């Protein structure tokens, strides 16, 4: 990255685009990490519901897994195939005999 040249203008200076990209990519990375953490937490809660065997909590957990996987695709955090895989595995865990 080239050093900044002193400008003669008074007022806010423009930020070099490479520096701006670093800042925005870090913001995006933090946002994506927090959402992935929410996905993992939802999957863990669903797994606990499956282990408890309560039908109502399994149904609610499966619904929340589907919802959060679809939101991840919509936000561009997961690809569609990964979301489909997560949902298929959760569905298989919900009713293993079917």
UniProtKB/Swiss-Prot annotation:
Signal peptide from the UniProt entry: none
GO BP annotations listed: translation
Claim: rRNA-binding is one of the keywords in the record: yes
GO molecular function: small ribosomal subunit rRNA binding; structural constituent of ribosome
Basic residues compositional bias, start-end: 1-12
Family: Belongs to the bacterial ribosomal protein bS20 family.
Job description of the protein: Binds directly to 16S ribosomal RNA.
Identification of the protein by name: Small ribosomal subunit protein bS20
The organism of origin for this protein: Chlamydia muridarum (strain MoPn / Nigg)
């Amino acid at each position: 990255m080239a050093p900044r040249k002193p400008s003669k203008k008074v007022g806010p200076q423009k930020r070099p685009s490479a520096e701006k990209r670093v800042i925005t990519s870090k913001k995006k990375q933090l946002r994506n990490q927090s959402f992935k953490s929410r996905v993992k937490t939802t999957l863990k809660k669903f797994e606990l519901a499956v282990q408890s065997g309560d039908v109502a909590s399994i149904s609610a957990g499966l619904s929340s897994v589907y919802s959060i996987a679809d939101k991840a695709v919509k936000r561009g955090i997961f690809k569609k195939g990964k979301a489909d895989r997560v949902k298929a595995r959760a569905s298989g865990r919900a009713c293993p005999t079917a």
